[in-house]
Each structure stands twice: as structure tokens, then as C-alpha cells.
Amino acid sequence: MEFFGMGYNFKLVEQEIQKRWDFKIAGNDGINCYVLGMFPYPSGNIHMGHIRNYTIGDVIARYKRAHGLKVLHPIGWDAFGLPAENAALSYGVNPAVWTERNIESMRKQLKSIGISYNWDRELATCKEDYYKHEQAFFLDFLQQGLAYRKESWVNWDPVDNTVLANEQVVDGRGWRSGAKIERRKLSQWFLKITDFADSLLDGLKTLDGWPEKVKLMQERWIGKTEGVILEFATSCGQKLEVFSTMPHMLFGASFCAVSAEHPILRHVTDEAFSARVRGIIECSGDEEKQKIGADTGLFATHPLLDRKLPIYAANYVLSEYGTGAVFGCPAHDQRDFEFAVAHGLDIYQVVFPDDGVQYDLQKEAYSGDGTYRNSEFLNGLRVDAARNAMIQKLESMGGCRRVTNYRLHDWGISRQRYWGCPIPVVHCEKCGIVPVDRQDLPISLPEEVDFSRGGNPLDHHPTWKHVQCPKCQSSAQRETDTFDTFFESSWYFAAFCSEQGGINAADCNKLLPVDYYIGGVEHAVLHLLYARFFCRALKKCGHLAVEEPFRNLITQGMVCHSVYRDAAGNYLFPEDAQRMIRDGEAVQRGKVEKMSKSKKNVVDPSHIIKKYGADTVRLFMLSDTPPERDIEWSDVGVEGAWRYLERLWRLFEDNSSIGADFDTADVKAEDRVYLSGIHKLLRGLSADMEHCRLNCAVAKFREMSNTVFEMVKCGVSQQVINESVCILLRVMEPFIPHIAEKLWERIGGEGMLCNRQWPSAREDLLTEDLVTIAVQVNGKLCSTLKVGAQCDGEEVKAEALKVAQRKLGDKEVRNIYFVPGRVVNIVTK
């Protein structure tokens, strides 16, 4: 089919080029680079965030291939999850069927963008041949003591009707549903991520290719603190152990606070108090809530003073942190201050700031440095010295021990849902919890389930959960909880390493860690932390030799758009807002925010691709903004990208003399100037690619194309134009691969452009400095000329005659005077 002579028809170009690409990767021999974007949940439609993520990864993969690397660049589907169950309820379709339809739809959409995936490595976590391996891992974890079951207080999402891990609760609400989280006590399965707390912290120091903000977020989430446990005698006779990182503030203590689940509360039997405690449990750990509490009527005895400290149950004290009990020092801790003010408790100041430091203890706690007073043996000491002195004193009394505490808790992996991986154990009245025999894996989900009764369909399935105990053969029941879906995403990067799926130790140890991992920063303390833990757990079980899954992490920014509302305050889609504006209707334009379905500030990728083509969308997504920063969607910007591609196409359409062959060993001085500029841009662009400054690379190849436009206009040597065009097409191919491939074919390029070597900048052209020469006729300036500083004088004179030809006309030249680096003066008769 003839493509040229009728304008840029991106639909025909992209369809043809996509049919010709083949990025299958047979076997693992020679693979020396692994590029991976965080795999998507198959919702049915890709969004602009997907396009940005996967285009960044594609540029890196294509660039690495151009340097001769054999790149593993796979794709898969994070396919378990609640939306599939919700679809089953809403539309009466089985979650497996719904998920497969969505995968098929999104597969077509991703292929339409031109991502160079190894589709032969595609996987879906809902397939038995995937999750049978993680069921086996779980059995390994049980054997190694890394998995256990216990009754504990959990975060219950009343909308999704399931338990959430601490990491999945954001500001007291479910990370997906947004529902207010409730506290319930249930038997749950846990993984002992806390066993690796120090290893996870130490490993952060080795991750030089990770953003500092992500490492800091993980460090804070793990939350290693050095403190002490103090023993307080109490009025009920039970010792109260209190954890504190600030024992030096003990002289300022005016109360003790315990979590609403603390064992000491068994000594309080008042029904009204119990009702208040239930209310405290509901909002425990919610920093947005007022500091609420209930007076137990119990007292603790201050270990150093004749002071009784009332004991309160408080919502800001968590049972999972430390001992679940603290002493309150309102003068020097803001949470204690707020609680003391709310409950009319005493405030004792013990640290006094230096002269000139402004503070108001009536309004807030003072947490700065200063000198101790009202503190007996600490009086006159500074804060650091006082801490050591207090610990030594308490240790000598025998009521104190030093401890290391972590904010990190074991990972609760039980979910009360159907559409997840079954946990491979059974419950037997005689034998207790019994692991399923490995030869019986996978434990598959039943296909016929009833979603109409609410709750977990596996709980009330008539046959699936009823089995024989593998140990004693008596009647038993399967575990009906399924794995948290983060279980699947914590090891999928290892599954891609093997053509057969699962984990092949030899393949994984060869290909891991992933060289470039691309995804959103919102996964810093969920997926990224769990994946690091999983590597360590699998190493302990003998499956892997590596501890860190990702060598370089690129956290792409969000795609943002203005938020629109109508006069009634209802959200509007951008296209509806523009129509209303054209019709003269009132539209409120709000701030620019992350694209969100709930606020309707979304742009449908399929609509934009249909209108402008994949290369236009790719180019816009990668222009102007660094990958790690948010990008604001702009219709004007998309139009600009489209116009650039049209102009590029016309250049080749109108100049059939452009070819892929060239010899620029001996070119004119002025032409050499252009070629030098191209090679200098190539050097800078290659450096940008190495450091993932993709927006800078785009700017340089656009500057390079402007130089080519100028060359054609000015009649530069065809050999120089050809070399420049070959460089231009090769460096733009990772970004806009469809049009680059077609233009490469247009100039007679050999083979597929995506298989061509990345060009190297010529050193002889990089070191050449340019100078501007004034061209005069009879002493009067008529033009200027850019030449290499080392250019031969005769060559410069010849070029000067060309640029002065119009001024000279028919005049006869008598002499030409050349002052190197400055001027050429042409004298006529």
C-alpha cells in the first residue's frame, strides 16, 4: 500500500507496523536487561496513568535493545480482587468470565499503543498455573515459621466486607472503598514480615537507584525506635509495663494511657465504661479524631515521685505498638497535651527553653531543647544528657529495660472474599490446622457460587469447603479465607523469569533484580515493601539468592486535569464542560487534580488514540515534564504533538531524495557545521537517555529535527542530510516508534529500525568549536558565516564567496582577505 502522497494517515501506519513487530523472547539465553512496569488490574479499560507508566518503560526497553542488550519486557494481569466480585453481584456474571473479558479488552488497548512487550511471557494471577505456586510458597512459609494464625484485632472494611492490612488503611479509611474502618477481633493468617525488619532497613542503604523519598517512606513505615520499658505498680495489683522513647520526661508525667484492648481493663467491670471502650476501639489510631478516652478509675504509682497517675483507655494508644501503654507528659508531647486538655489533667513542665525562645504552654506542648527543672537529679541538664541519666537511674532501680521497637507489624493476609487465591490448609477438630498435601495443589476455586447471600460465598458453599483431613481422614473444612491480592503481586516479577511460570531458581538468580521497575509512588509502603519482604522470605525457603527485587525504581508522576462543575456543583467530563462553555452555559473550573473517575476529570485514551494516533499520545506524555513529576493534560499540547508528526511526515513526503546511504568523511565547512550540531545533540540526548531524562531527550530530538528542516531548506549536502536523518529516526524510535519505522522504510533503510544499533557521536565533530566570521564586500558587512575554528582558509574563502554572491552580482573579484576567526573581506575591481 502506498502511504506517501496522501498525508500522514496514522491509522494505516500504526496498524501495519504493529503487525510487523515481533518481540517474542525465546528462552533466557543472553537476556541481560529486565524492564518491568507494575502490572495492571484488569478493570477493562486502560487510563492515562497506564499509558504514561508503560510508555516510559517501553522507551527504556527500546533504548536498551538499541545498545545490543537482550531485554526481558513482559506484561501480566493482577487479576484477583474485589471489583470482579462486585461485578458478579451487579451483572450476574462469574468473576472469572468478567476478568477474562477485561483482560482481552485491555490487551487490545495496550497493543494499540505500540508497547514492545514480550507477549509470550504474559500471565494472569487468577490462573491456577500461577497461584498453585504461591500456595506452595505458603506451605514453605508454614514450615519455616513465617506464617501463623492468631486471633487479633483487625481493620474491618464494612463496604468491602473484608479485613485490611494496616498499610491499606489511609487516614482511618479503606484504601479502595474509602469506608470508615471498624475494629473487630477475628482469627487471621499473618506473615512474619517483622522477622526481617532490620534487613529491610539495612537493604534500603543499598538501593542507590531508588528515589530518596520512597526509601524514607519505607524507613518511617518500618519505624525502628530505641526506647525503654518501665514498670509501674498499679492500684489493681497488676504491673503496668509502659514503652517510652522519652524516659527523661518521666518527671513531667501526669497520667498513663492504655489501648482499648489492654489486659488491665479486665479489672474494670463497669458497663458504662465498657460501652465507652467500644467507642474508643472504633476510632483507635485515627489521627484525625479528637483524643478521646475513658477513665478506668485505676492509678499507677510514679516510680520516682509520690504521685498517683490516673490510668485512661485512649484512642491514640495502639495495642500493636510497644506495650500498648504509655505515660503521658502533656507539657512536652502534643498528643498527650491534647488529651490532658480534653480531660482536665495536670500539666507539669520540666524542660525550659533558652532565653528568647517563644512558646505558649497554654496552647501547645513544648518539644524543643532546653534545660531541666523540677526534675531532681536531672535539674540543670540538657535533654540529651538527661535521657542517659534517667535510663541509668531507672536501670539501677531494676524497673527499666532497654528495647528496640518497630512501627511495622506482621502482615495480615486473610481476606473474607471469594475471588482470591485459596489458602491451602484445612481445619480438623482432631488435628487442628493441617496443611494440604503438595500433590493436591492447586486448591482451585469452585465455579458455581452464590453471591446473593452476602459475605464470603466460600463460607456457605454446599460442597467445596467439606473435605477429609489429610492427616486423620476424618471430616474437616477447608480454610475459606483467601489471600490478600498483594500476595500475588509480591512475587510476579520472579514468575516472568521462567517460560514455565512459577519460580525457577536458576532463571531468577540470573535475571533478578529487575533493572528498571516503573510504577506510582503510592505503592511505596504496600507493594514495594511486601515485594522486598517476599524476596527475603523466598530466599530463606531456598527459592531465591537475591534479597532486593528492583535495582532501579522509577516512580512516574500522575496525569492531572482541571476539575469542572456545573452551576449545581455536579462534576462534568471535560468534553461536556467545553460544550457547555461554547453554548454559553455556566461552568466552574476548579484546580488541577489527579485524573479521577469520581470527579470526571478524565480523558479516554481510546478516544485520543482514535483521533490522533498512538505516537501523538506517547509524544505528549513524554514531552516537557520529567517522568517523576505530575503532568497536566493539555488539549493544546496534544495538538502540538500531532502537528509536529504531520510536519515530520511532510518532510519525507516532499523530499524523495532523502536516503539511508551516506558518506560524510569529506564535506564542506558549512555543511560540517550542521553535522557537528547534530552529533552534539546526539551526545546530549544519549546522556539524557542514560539518566532517564526522557523529556530532555524529546526536546533534543525535536531540536535535531528542526536542524534537518533547516538543512533541506538551505540546500545542505545530501550526504549530510542523509546521515542526520538516519540519526534522527533512530533516536526518536523509542518514543514514536510507528512513524519512525515507516519513515525509515521510506528512505530505504535496511531491516526494522527497532533492530538497528544506537548511533555514536563522532568525536571529531564534538571537539570542533564554531566561530562566526563576518563576510564583507569592499569593507562593508553583507553577511556572516559559521565555520569550524580549525577550518582551512581557502575553504572559508570559498564559502564566503557563496554567501556574498547576491551582493557581488556581476562584479569581478580582485582579491580576498581572510583574518582567521574574524572576517573575510572580498574586494572587487
From Swiss-Prot:
InterPro entries: aa-tRNA-synth_I_CS, aa-tRNA-synth_Ia, Leu-tRNA-ligase, Leu_tRNA-synth_edit, M/V/L/I-tRNA-synth_anticd-bd, Methionyl/Leucyl_tRNA_Synth, Rossmann-like_a/b/a_fold, tRNAsynth_Ia_anticodon-bd. Its EC number is 6.1.1.4. One of its GO terms (cellular component) is cytosol. A motif ('KMSKS' region) lies at residues 594-598. GO terms for molecular function: aminoacyl-tRNA deacylase activity; ATP binding; leucine-tRNA ligase activity. It is found in: Cytoplasm. Belongs to the class-I aminoacyl-tRNA synthetase family. This is Leucine--tRNA ligase. It comes from Anaplasma marginale (strain St. Maries). The gene is leuS.
